[in-house]
């Protein structure tokens, strides 16, 4: 398995926002620690900060522990999903990067990739509890699968794709892996549409991953809980990667009486960052501040 070397996206925007933290010696909660890239930069920028990093992925935690080892006892790593967490004290900043990390996408065994053949898994807690993507598509009726692909993937060909998937399952019993599913989805597109920058299976795989991990439900719980994790004037910053997430973040920051928006519009990657790391092209960064009187 290749090393967990995730490149933090929108790093300059995150560091710029962190200049607003109410005090330099407070607690930073990285709710999606990953390889620790964002946290390492923030700890370097603010030598008095302490970090609690949350991640349910054992590979990510191990990589983060190695990357953050030089910060010693300023760092604590917790094996948990951020939706289940209660912090020991108020934080000056809560950060969440909602994207699937490059190492997760690039390891076939995780089952996230439509470019690399692997088992149809897609669980963030690899090998843990919960339904796999293969089990999900086998369980759902055709119309339910179509609704899921449309609702979570915003896929206009969802009916055709669901019909093809269920027909394949009837004929073969199950898919051999991610490559077979990706091939089936691509076959639902006209030939001209298969040669674009975005792979035809992108939206379907996104929908399955969101459903398997209850990503939107988990995000809703974070948006409800995280403001209470903050001390007055503390920051809540979230990086989202698709419109379903970004709409939720935008709406929460607008309506939550505990928060005041810092970013009126989302910060996106520069052309230079997109060229260096193409996965940043859909990233959006929004920041809000905890109101002192809320």
UniProtKB/Swiss-Prot annotation:
Example of a GO MF term: rRNA (cytosine-N4-)-methyltransferase activity
Reactions performed catalytically: cytidine(1402) in 16S rRNA + S-adenosyl-L-methionine = N(4)-methylcytidine(1402) in 16S rRNA + S-adenosyl-L-homocysteine + H(+)
A Pfam family hit: Methyltransf_5
Family, per entry: Belongs to the methyltransferase superfamily. RsmH family.
Name this protein carries in UniProt: Ribosomal RNA small subunit methyltransferase H
The protein's enzyme class: transferase
UniProt keyword terms in alphabetical order: Cytoplasm, Methyltransferase, rRNA processing, S-adenosyl-L-methionine, Transferase
Cited HAMAP family: 16SrRNA_methyltr_H
Residues binding S-adenosyl-L-methionine: 36-38, 55, 82, 97, 104
Principal location: cytoplasm
Listed InterPro entries: RsmH, SAM-dep_MeTrfase_MraW_recog, SAM-dependent_MTases_sf
Task performed by this protein: Specifically methylates the N4 position of cytidine in position 1402 (C1402) of 16S rRNA.
Domain of life: Bacteria
GO biological process, one term: rRNA base methylation
EC number: 2.1.1.199
Subcellular location(s) of the protein: Cytoplasm
Gene Ontology CC: one annotated term: cytoplasm
